[in-house]
Amino acid sequence: MVGKNFSGKQMSEAFINSAFLALSGGFQDAYTYNTRNEVFSNAQTGNVVLMSQHFMTGDWKAGVRYLLPLIAFVLGVFVADQIQMRYKYARRLHWRQGILLAEIVILFVVGFIPHSLNMTATIFVSFARAMQVQTFRKMGGYSYASTMCIGNLRSGTAAFSHYLQDKKTEQLKQAAYYFGIIFLFAIGAGLGGNLTEHFGIHMIWISCILLGLSFLLMFENE
């Protein structure tokens, strides 16, 4: 049976699984920013800011460059949610593993898309990232995001603040989980930025490897 449980929680929530997802998440954001015309695949707040700025100045073409990844992100969340509702109780393959396989295939294709089609590549990555963030929302029982930092930063800081007040070990553990994921996201982004700068568009395949490890991990018990 796939998608096994550990201590009443699904293996998809294990910290080690979240670590692979966070590394991949940081890598992908650095990849699209550095190799695909400085557009974020996941930091949609930044895309909203830049889109609005260009629209307000009448630069519609530049604004659309940031609008399309936003639309792709919305569609990715919608598709992942539909897959969950339809295949939540599938026994042959856990629905989360199905999402990972789809993401791996999409990112593998992106590695072949030339610079002349950078917008297409960014749209594909945004769609895949949205499916991931919608699919993996818990880590060790805590709500988190594997593809962005702001929510994790808030939650980690709040947990540490509560620990200073209450001195509960669980609160310190929670803070460590969140800051650990942020650190791993940053490592992924650093690697993504440097590797793509030196070796180009094919480096997105490293994210495929990381997601593949997450996929395989979900066959195991903790």
Model-flagged regions — what are they?
Residues 2-222:
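Alpha-helical transmembrane segments of multi-pass membrane proteins
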